[in-house]
């Protein structure tokens, strides 16, 4: 029974996962490619806000770094954590497996050109994240005990309410909360834990590993570790991420540089393949639309622009100016 537990869990969850994926990524056919409506919406929103705010992702990038590293910190401002703690809390969700596995999946589906579309999506997605985090910070609620409630739930309910759409705002907030819970179990936990555990299994002997076919055990261990951290709330999370994320980022960047330097001679050929595949106008899977769709979908999963999770992490930061403070979101989209 225990030996088949992994398979039983997968058998149970796969139909549920497929149904949710089909609903979220509802699509239409265009020149032989299935284009999800949500992809078009995110692309349009990213482009619109980038032009509307006159490319804040370029001209305020330096200020974003200054805010992130505490230049404008003020302990007297309302909130629970510092700018750097909120920055690292958000970064902890964007650095890592989404970037590694996400890029590999995008390339396998859309060809090398998907990598270019991931980069372009991240560039314009910087402004999209800036907007959603600004709204999350503006409509946050600071309770009497000093704790903060914020995020998409607040700006959907309160923001839409101010526009006169009270019932619609409440419905969207409730719907988002339900989706957020589902997303945290799926992409936020199961995928991350599964991929991390698979690496441990590979490093300890693959099929001969004592942990082989015991993914459930890895899930329990990861759940215990994460639970120990998050049970203390956002302050506990911030204290851990401000120490752990810089180390994680250093290892990540060092590993990337090592791989690039080790394969330095292949860089020109790789760049050529990326651009030639990205602008290939064939109707095949590796064509223009296939690369674009694969790149955008994986980029959103990787950098979390437009999905509503980032405002939750940034809302508790100590600040009295949502627009000035949320410049620090810009660098997180580049990871």
Q: What do these predicted regions represent?
A:
Residues 64-75, 142-159:
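Juxtamembrane inter-helical linkers in multi-pass membrane proteins
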Residues 1-97, 107-114, 125:
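N-terminal alpha-helical transmembrane segments of multi-pass membrane transport
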Residues 326-332:
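Conserved small/polar residues in nucleotide/adenosyl-binding loops
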Residues 41-44, 49-65, 172, 193-200, ...:
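Membrane-interface loop-to-helix entry segments
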Residues 241-245, 249-321:
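Acidic, glycine-rich loop-and-beta core segments that form the ion-binding/anion-interacting portion
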Residues 49-50, 91-92, 121-148, 157-192, ...:
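Helix-loop-helix module between adjacent transmembrane segments
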Residues 107-114, 140-149, 161-163, 315-325:
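Juxtamembrane helix-boundary/capping and inter-helix hinge elements in multi-pass membrane proteins
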Residues 39-45, 82-90, 165-182, 218-221, ...:
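Select transmembrane alpha-helical segments in multipass membrane proteins
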């Amino acid at each position: 029974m225990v030996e088949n537990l992994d398979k039983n869990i997968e058998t149970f969850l796969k139909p549920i996962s497929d149904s949710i994926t089909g609903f979220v990524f509802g699509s239409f056919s265009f020149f032989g490619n299935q284009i999800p409506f949500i992809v078009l919406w995110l692309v349009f929103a990213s482009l619109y806000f980038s032009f509307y705010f006159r490319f804040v992702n370029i001209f305020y990038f330096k200020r974003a770094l200054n805010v992130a590293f505490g230049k404008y910190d003020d302990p007297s401002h309302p909130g629970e954590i510092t700018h750097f703690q909120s920055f690292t809390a958000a970064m902890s969700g964007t650095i890592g497996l989404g970037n590694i596995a996400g890029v590999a999946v995008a390339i396998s589906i859309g060809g090398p050109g998907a990598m270019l579309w991931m980069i372009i999506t991240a560039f314009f997605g910087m402004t999209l994240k800036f907007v959603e985090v600004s709204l999350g910070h503006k409509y946050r609620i600071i309770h009497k005990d000093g704790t903060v409630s914020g995020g998409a739930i607040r700006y959907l309910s309160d923001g839409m309410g101010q526009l006169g759409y009270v019932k619609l705002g409440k419905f969207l907030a409730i719907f988002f909360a339900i989706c957020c819970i589902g997303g945290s179990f799926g992409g936020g936990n199961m995928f991350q834990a599964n991929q991390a555990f698979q690496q441990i299994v590979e490093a300890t002997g693959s099929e001969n590993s004592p942990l082989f076919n015991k993914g459930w055990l890895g899930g329990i261990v990861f759940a215990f570790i994460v639970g120990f951290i998050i049970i203390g709330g956002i302050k506990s999370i911030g204290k851990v991420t401000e120490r752990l994320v810089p180390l994680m980022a250093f290892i990540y960047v060092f590993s990337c540089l090592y791989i690039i330097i080790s394969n330095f001679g292949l860089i020109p050929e790789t760049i050529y393949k990326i651009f030639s595949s990205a602008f290939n106008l064939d109707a095949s899977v590796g064509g223009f639309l296939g690369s674009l769709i694969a790149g955008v979908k994986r980029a959103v999963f990787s950098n979390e622009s437009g999905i509503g999770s980032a405002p939750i992490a940034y809302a508790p930061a100590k600040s009295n100016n949502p627009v000035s403070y949320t410049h620090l979101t810009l660098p997180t989209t580049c990871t």
